[in-house]
Amino acid sequence: FEKIVEIEDLVSINKENTEITKLNESAGVEKVKLSNLSYDILKKGIEYSKLSNGSYDITIGPLVKLWSIGLEGAKVPSKDEINEAIGYIDYNNIEINDSTKEAFLTKEGMEVDLGSIAKGYAADEVVKILKQEGIRSAIIDLGGNIYALGSKNSDNNWNVGIQDPFSDRG
């Protein structure tokens, strides 16, 4: 799926030279011009952060980085590390400009992580393509983010399990 690769190449924080990696590296230093797609995902992330009063906050990057979730070397960080990272988390410290599609993280050390919203955005794009192709039933798994389209078959709904986060993966 080319669309998924396109989105990942723009907004992943686990790849070098993505637009969001550049934004994070420029935190507290300078504005970054974004593509329409990256800007739209960032703006939607800010909107959801506001709607949840920060319970969902796209500037969670420093905290996510501590855990290294999904990467080699994943660990549970210390309380001190967590408390330090929390000081960088505040979506109100993102400035955006709709006319120039520029974004600025006002505090050095801030990091945006659009992984959750980008995966949802990518899933929505895949669903559009599948529906255009006449597919009415599918499970889309984008790194643990699941989209269930339709039902398993005419008699059964999809069953989705949730793994205990403290058990071994398997």
Residue spans of the language-model regions?
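Mature catalytic core of soluble alpha/beta enzymes
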Residues: 1-170
